[in-house]
Amino acid sequence: RQSLAVLAEARRQHQPGRCLLLGAHLEGPFLAPQKRGAHPSEHLCAPSLAELERRISGFEDDIALVTLAPELPGAEEVIAALRQRGVVVSLGHSAADERTARLAYQQGVGMITHCFNAMAGLHHRAPGPVGALLGSPPVALGVIADGIHIAPAMAALLQRLFPEQVVLVSDALAPYGLPPGTYPWDERSIAVADGTCRLEDGTVAGTTLTLPDGVV
């Protein structure tokens, strides 16, 4: 809520000719624990309308996008509540299979936060959320095109299959613009090398990528 308050104030102080802040992306807290990536487990919780209100009350107009795991019990009503408010709901940090993902798209989930990262891959016997895109309503496909999060060939495949739906995502973290090294990151430290941010255990946490760097 502290971050939302800062964003809301920045939006109120918008100056003509300056970058327009369209709204916050809440990547959590309704994430699958086994797919949490770099998100601390103590920050996660089960989806419910009460938990949603506790986090966004007073800032409803400042939130543009929410990432959640649609397979979690309670997610369906949270998705409906967010869509009613005009918030884009994105599948991410999720263990959803093809069937669950397809149902989520039909319920109004309109994006995949970062394709192939912290979610099931595209397997010939288990197509997962990406396979569920075929025959579903159009969904925006977030792609972290740093060559680490997703292989360049797979990024090119997505672009070929869904040319109007791919959205570049920088996934840039606080060390953006800083040289390689180790930096404090919340209560942890994060190592930056070759444009990639990793936790001490080697978990890929994000990038220091600019969006133009992802264009070839």
Please describe what each predicted stretch is.
Residues 78, 100-216:
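Active-site-adjacent C-terminal substructures of enzyme catalytic domains
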